[in-house]
Structures are given as C-alpha cells and as structure tokens.
C-alpha cells in the first residue's frame, strides 16, 4: 500500500489525477447529494470531527470558494499539522511537498491534494494532541477520511471545477502520513476498539455512502480500499499497512479503468491518509460546502457506530459500491437502456411495424381475403402467416356462414353446375358472380351451392390468393369502402385469373367485353365455370345480374355495380335478406374490423346483391 500511496500521491498531485478526480467528483457529488447517506456522513463528520471541525469550516470556505490559495494554505497548515504529528509528519509533509508541487502544477490537482492535506492536517495535529484518543476517532475519521477523502475526490472533481482544487492538494500530500497515522491510529484504536472501531465504522459507512455517491470506479476501488484499508489498517502495523494499503489501493485504482482511476488512487491515498480522523474531517466539510460535505462531516463524528457496525458498514459499503456500480452501469446502462429503449423504440418500431402489421393485419383481417387478393399492399402489410391463418379460419367461418345463408337461400340445382364453374374459376368469383346472376334470377339456388362453392373457391383462393396478393399491389389502389366487396370478388378474380393488377384492369376494362360473352345469367355462371379467368367472368356475371346497368357501371366498381344490379334486380329483397344475414354475421366480424365492417355495411346499405353481400361477408369473415 506504500507504493500505492507513493504512486497514488504523485498522481494525485499530478494533473491527470486531478482531472480524474474532477470527473469522479462530478459523478460522486451528484450521487452523494442524491444519496441519503450524505446526511449521515455529514453528521458523523461533524460529531467526530470536533477537533478538525474548525479546520473543516475553514476548509469548507476554501473549498467552497474554490481558491487555490486557500488550498495551498490548507496544505501548508496541514504540513504544519503534519509537523505537529508525531511520526506522521514526515509522510504527511512529504505528501504536502508533493501536494505543493501538484498545486503549483495544477489547480485541480491542488484542490485534490488540498483535500488530502486537509484530511491529513487534522490527523497529524490530532495525532500529536491525542494520538490514541484521536486514533480511535481518527480511525473513525480515518475510515471516514478514506471514504470522505473519496468523497472529497468526488467533490474535488466538482471543486476542481469550482473550489475543490485547493482541498485536493492537501489530501494528496497527506496520503502517506495520513495512511501511517491512520494505521497507527487504528492500531491505537485496537486498544479502543469501541470508540475507534465505531469511528472507523462510521467512516466506513460514510465512505461507503460517499463512494456510492462517488463514481462507480472510485466507489468500487474505494470500497475494497475502505474495507481492505480498515481491515489492513487495523490488522497491519502502521508502518507496513500504510504502504501496503496504499499499494493495494493503488493497485485497485490501477485496476479501475475509469478516468477517475487516478482520482480513485488519490482518493484511496486520501482515504488511507484519511484514516487519520483529521484527514476525513476536512474532506467531509468541503463536501458540506458542496452540500454533501456538511452531511458527511457531522455524521462520522457525531455517530460513533460500534465496531460491529463498522464491519456491517463495510459490508454496506460494498453493497453500496455494488449498487453504485450498477448505477454507473445504469449510467452506462442508462445509455444502454436508452439504447435498449431505442432498440425498444426500434423494437417498438418493430413492434410498431408489427403493430402496423397488426393494424395492417386489422386491415388484412378486414380484407384478409380481400387484402390478400384485393390489395397485395394490405396483404404485404399483414403477415403472410396471419393472412393464411385468418384466411383459412375465415374461409371456414365463411363456409359455415355461406352454408347457413345457403340453407336460407336454399337451392342448389343450378348451383351444382356453379360448383364446377366455381371450382374451375376458384369458385368464389364464379360463386359471387353466379350469386349476383342468380339473384338476378338464380339468386337463392345458386346462393346455396355458390356459397359452398364460394367457400371452396375462396379456400382455393386463400392458397392462391396469397400468391396473388403479390399482384394485389395493383389492388392496393383499388381498396375502397365500395370497392372492398368488389375487390373481394376481384381478389378472388385476381388469384384465379392473373397474378397482376392487369387482371383487375381486365376486370374493370374487360367486364364490358365479358357481358356479351355471358348474356344469360346461367351462361355467365357457365362462363366462370368454363373460364378460369375470373376477372372477366366475374365481371360478366356481375354485369349479367343487372345486365345493362352493371355493364356500364362495372368499370366504376364491380361491387357497386353488383350491388346496384342486384338491388335493381328482383332478387334485391333476397339479396337484402342475405345481406342482412351477412350483415349480421359480417357485423359480428365488423366489430373486429371497422373498415371492413363499414365497407360491408355500405354494401349492405346500398342493397348490394346477395352475392356482393356474401362476398363482403366472406371477405369480412376472412378479414376477421
């Protein structure tokens, strides 16, 4: 630890250590101020510091003022105090010399060493006055000093910025002397385990708290130093322990990767130096100046924890250090967490994507069949798996609904032909077209078979519709409240006839051509049967039900055309009944999918043909 003290002291005196201290103090000060422990430390420091209280007050003003002169003066006074100290004077004076050079070199380093010196001065002076008594108190303060010096380093970082520079220098200077003195005091404490150990415990507790407040690196290093320092100080002879402890602390500081490592080393030195009660007191007071110092200074002196408490406090210190490390990691973790949040944001982005996917799924659910067939965009928006699953489930639901509607619509003779045509045409469009045609004249009979066939055809379309959904990119433009049901027919048509929007264009453009191909509704039904090209066939069938009007309207929207022709047709009432059934069922589904529901409702309100309604219902069920 001697090497540590020596090494640590020069670094403390050196600017780099001061810089490190600065960083550490910034971090430490925040934590210290944030922590509940500062008040405890302050109380202990105030009570235990008694003798060093006056010096502490001066140190506070100096540190608070952030005057390098005050730091130098405190260093000189500490040196004088070191001279007063028995054998500690030499190390503390040497430290003072180092501190003086450091203070001259860097104000920040000066503040750091001044803190160390301040810690050392009371130690030296008090050691001269009452070596053993203060040894107990010093050990309190010594442990306190270790932690408080750690605190000083933390505050010194702040003080370096503001006023800590003056106090840092003495602490760095005092390190060796304070270590020796603190070790001596600890040994002296051994006779006075109760008072000294409690003080040490108080120091340990304070230091641990301070360490918690301090940078994680400093805290982690200091805790081992505080725990090891206390144990080592009390266990090892004063001459050996200060060096060994300093080396160990130095090693710990070296181990610390943080820029505060030098600070930690200096803080450790200061902490070791701070083993002497005086050392601890001034640092605590500067902390009070920072707002942490006041709490830290009174606590160690005022509260004399039993020796057992010192052990417990050491444990607490380590726990605190661990927590501080976690906090620092949290700071890093804060970043990491922020990154995670960003990732979460990204994940939420992913989630959002999935949510849009879900929303899109909602849309696909709205149009799962329609979307897959109608708009590849929607299908693209919705996960393929979801679409497939929903499509299959909805197809099953649709098949049941269609069967129910078919049972209501009744009649399957003409529909028997339709199943073939629907199967050939993939049934849904043929079924819907036939339904429209049948509603024109075959409404109920084809509806039953058409529903079954539509279910079959749609089931086929589910499989085919998904690949067709790629074509749905063109369809993505088509989706509209009115176009939804038509799109569902067209969806089916697209999967059947073509994989591209061309089929839809054909549906819009070619439907006029198709109607001549299937003038009779039955012929139209046969057309879908014979013709796999559903867009044209479907359009023809849709047109056929309302023959003339649909032909003109088809280009506008098959759904509307189908619905208008159906409404115009005598089967409008049937379509309305079917539509109402579909509406009830689809509305059940609509509850889940407002858009699809709205579209379906619009279709039903417009009196879309039973086929259109069924198509919408199937689409809605598929969507749902």
From Swiss-Prot:
Keywords: Cell membrane, Lipid-binding, Membrane, Wnt signaling pathway
GO cellular component terms, semicolon-separated: plasma membrane
Stretches for region Disordered: 1-308, 342-596
InterPro entries in alphabetical order: AMER (IPR019003)
Biased composition (Basic and acidic residues): 74-91, 120-132, 247-258, 450-464
Low complexity bias locations: 101-111, 272-282, 295-307
Residue stretches of biased makeup (Gly residues): 406-416
Topology versus the membrane: Peripheral membrane protein
MF (Gene Ontology): beta-catenin binding; phosphatidylinositol-4,5-bisphosphate binding
Cellular compartments annotated: Cell membrane
Extent of Polar residues compositional bias: 535-549
Domain of life the protein comes from: Eukaryota
Statement: the UniProt record of this protein carries the keyword Cell membrane: yes
Gene Ontology process terms (BP): ectoderm development; negative regulation of canonical Wnt signaling pathway; regulation of canonical Wnt signaling pathway; Wnt signaling pathway
Function statement: Negative regulator of the canonical Wnt signaling pathway involved in neuroectodermal patterning. Acts by specifically binding phosphatidylinositol 4,5-bisphosphate (PtdIns(4,5)P2), translocating to the cell membrane and interacting with key regulators of the canonical Wnt signaling pathway, such as components of the beta-catenin destruction complex.
Family note: Belongs to the Amer family.
Record protein name field: APC membrane recruitment protein 2
UniProt organism field: Gallus gallus (Chicken)
């Amino acid at each position: 630890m001697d090497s540590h003290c020596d090494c640590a002291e020069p670094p403390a005196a050196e600017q780099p250590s001061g810089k490190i201290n600065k960083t550490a103090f910034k971090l430490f000060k925040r934590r210290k101020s944030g922590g509940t422990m500062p008040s405890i430390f302050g109380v202990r420091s105030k009570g235990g510091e008694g003798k060093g209280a006056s010096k502490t007050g001066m140190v506070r003003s100096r540190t608070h003022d952030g005057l390098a002169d005050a730091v130098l003066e405190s260093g000189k006074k500490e040196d004088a105090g070191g001279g007063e100290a028995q054998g500690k004077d030499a190390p503390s004076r040497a430290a003072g010399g180092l501190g003086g050079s450091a203070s001259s070199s860097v104000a920040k380093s000066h503040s750091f060493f001044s803190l160390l010196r301040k810690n050392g001065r009371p130690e030296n002076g008090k050691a001269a006055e009452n070596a053993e008594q203060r040894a107990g108190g010093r050990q309190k303060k010594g442990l306190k000093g270790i932690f408080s010096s750690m605190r000083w380093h933390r505050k010194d970082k702040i003080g370096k910025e503001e006023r800590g520079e003056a106090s840092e220098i003495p602490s760095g200077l005092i390190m060796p002397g304070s270590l020796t003195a603190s070790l001596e005091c600890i040994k002296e404490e051994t006779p006075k385990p109760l008072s000294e150990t409690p003080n040490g415990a108080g120091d340990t507790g304070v230091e641990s708290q301070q360490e918690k407040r301090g940078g994680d690196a400093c805290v982690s290093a200091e805790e081992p130093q505080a725990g090891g320092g206390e144990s080592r100080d009390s266990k090892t002879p004063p001459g050996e322990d200060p060096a060994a402890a300093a080396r160990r602390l130095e090693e710990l500081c070296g181990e610390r990767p943080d820029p505060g490592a030098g600070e930690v080393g200096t803080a450790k030195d200061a902490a070791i130096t701070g083993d002497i009660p005086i050392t601890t007191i001034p640092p605590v007071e500067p902390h009070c100046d920072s707002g942490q110092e006041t709490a830290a200074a009174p606590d160690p002196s005022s509260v004399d924890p039993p020796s057992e408490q010192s052990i417990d406090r050491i444990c607490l210190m380590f726990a605190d250090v661990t927590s501080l490390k976690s906090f620092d990691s949290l700071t890093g973790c804060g970043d990491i967490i922020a990154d995670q949040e960003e990732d979460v944001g990204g994940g939420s982005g992913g989630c959002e994507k999935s949510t849009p996917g879900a929303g899109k799924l909602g849309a696909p659910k709205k149009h799962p069949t329609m979307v897959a067939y109608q708009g590849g965009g929607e299908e693209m928006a919705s996960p393929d798996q979801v679409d497939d699953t929903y499509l299959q489930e909805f197809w099953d639901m649709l098949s049941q609904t269609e069967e129910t509607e078919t049972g209501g619509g009744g009649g399957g003779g003409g529909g028997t032909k339709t199943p073939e045509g629907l199967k050939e045409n993939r049934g849904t469009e043929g079924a819907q077209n036939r339904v429209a045609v049948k509603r024109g004249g075959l409404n109920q009979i084809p509806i039953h078979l058409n529903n079954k066939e539509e279910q079959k055809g749609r089931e086929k379309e589910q499989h085919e519709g998904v690949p067709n959904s790629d074509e749905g990119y063109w369809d993505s433009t088509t989706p509209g409240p009115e176009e939804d049901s038509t799109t569902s027919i067209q969806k089916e048509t697209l999967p059947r006839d073509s994989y591209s929007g061309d089929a839809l264009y054909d549906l819009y453009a070619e439907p006029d051509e198709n109607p001549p191909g299937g003038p009779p509704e039955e012929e139209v039904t046969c057309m879908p049967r014979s013709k796999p090209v559903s867009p044209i066939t479907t359009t023809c069938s849709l047109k056929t039900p309302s023959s003339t009007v649909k032909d003109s309207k088809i280009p506008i929207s098959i759904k509307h055309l189908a619905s208008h022709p159906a409404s115009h047709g005598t089967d409008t009432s049937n379509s309305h009944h079917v539509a109402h059934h579909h509406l009830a069922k689809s509305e059940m589904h609509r509850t889940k999918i407002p858009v699809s529901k709205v579209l379906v409702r619009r279709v039903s309100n417009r009196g879309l043909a039973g086929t259109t309604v069924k198509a919408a219902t199937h689409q809605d069920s598929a969507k749902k």
